[in-house]
């Protein structure tokens, strides 16, 4: 099987490197490791933090991007979320969804913002004017007053789910054909039938595979502080001391292998990231029958 090289728009780190804490050299080294894994482009994703720390890491990531072409921009997942669906995020650092608050950390290198659309106070329209991708996530509602969003962050996770009695973020994501949907198809974050429903309901060109990988991914660590919480990895999944499921402990090549063995993988899911971010397709990966990458041409 041949596919395009992988673009990952949602990962918090890997190999022990945390984008909320890492220095320039650490990020550059991680970029090289990800490239060896077949991931040619990625959007370092920042979890909720203080404005000061967030601004610092935006600057660090921008400087690292000057040294490696794989860093395509920043995905700001934190700060503008709904505490009801905070997940592993530290809600103490959440801020109201206003233009004024966004300007406290605004930077042209921020390319994706995850937010709770039901709490919007003018931020969505401003972000779209700046050509920033707006994604609904860690939320319980949908856009208001005719506003539009571009995508949905880790569909089904940290959002109001499917119900036959009331509207929800998940239902809106499935029914809106124009909206892209991220999904963590690692076999842990989304149950197989829910995944099949997503893949059957959404247009095939609107599904984006993501890992939401934690810094502990592909490291020898069994515990690590992430998003101000101590995360424990049991060899299969990572959770906080309270039992909250954190991000994935797999990278996208691992997830593609899982999907392939379930006969659920479509090469278009890789192509969609190029389309979403207007990136010119280039290069290829060659996979064997067991969904291992055997050749990289890029």
Predicted regions and their residues:
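Di-metal (Zn2+ and/or Mg2+/Mn2+) metal-binding site signature of metallo-dependent hydrolases
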Residues: 2-24
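Residue-level marker for buried hydrophobic side chains located in beta-strands
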Residues: 5-7, 74, 134-136, 207-210
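Short, well-structured alpha-helical segments that form the helix of a local strand-helix-strand
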Residues: 264-273
């Amino acid at each position: 099987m041949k596919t395009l090289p992988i673009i990952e728009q949602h990962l918090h780190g890997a190999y022990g490197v945390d984008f909320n804490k890492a220095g320039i050299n650490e990020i550059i080294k991680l970029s090289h490791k990800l490239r060896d894994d077949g991931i040619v482009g990625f959007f370092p994703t920042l979890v909720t933090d203080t404005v000061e720390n967030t601004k610092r890491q935006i600057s660090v990531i921008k400087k690292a991007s000057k040294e490696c072409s794989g860093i395509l921009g920043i995905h700001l997942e934190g700060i503008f979320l709904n505490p009801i669906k905070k997940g592993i995020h530290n809600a103490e650092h959440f801020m109201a969804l206003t233009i004024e608050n966004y300007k406290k950390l605004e930077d042209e290198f921020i390319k994706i913002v995850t937010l709770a659309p039901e709490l919007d106070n003018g931020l969505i329209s401003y972000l779209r004017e700046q050509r920033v991708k707006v994604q609904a996530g860690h939320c319980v509602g949908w856009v208001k007053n005719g506003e539009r969003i571009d995508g949905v962050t880790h569909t089904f996770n940290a959002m109001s789910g499917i119900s036959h009695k009331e509207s929800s973020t998940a239902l809106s994501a499935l029914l809106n054909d124009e909206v892209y949907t991220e999904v963590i198809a690692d076999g842990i974050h989304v149950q197989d039938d829910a995944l099949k429903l997503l893949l059957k309901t959404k247009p095939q060109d609107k599904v984006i595979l993501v890992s939401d990988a934690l810094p502990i991914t592909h490291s020898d660590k069994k515990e690590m502080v992430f998003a101000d919480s101590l995360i424990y990895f049991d060899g299969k999944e990572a959770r906080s001391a309270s039992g909250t499921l954190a991000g994935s402990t797999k990278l996208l090549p691992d997830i593609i292998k899982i999907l392939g063995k379930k006969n659920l993988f479509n090469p278009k899911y890789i192509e969609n990231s190029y389309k979403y971010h207007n990136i010119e397709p280039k290069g290829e990966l060659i996979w064997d029958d067991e969904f291992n990458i055997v050749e990289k041409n890029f």
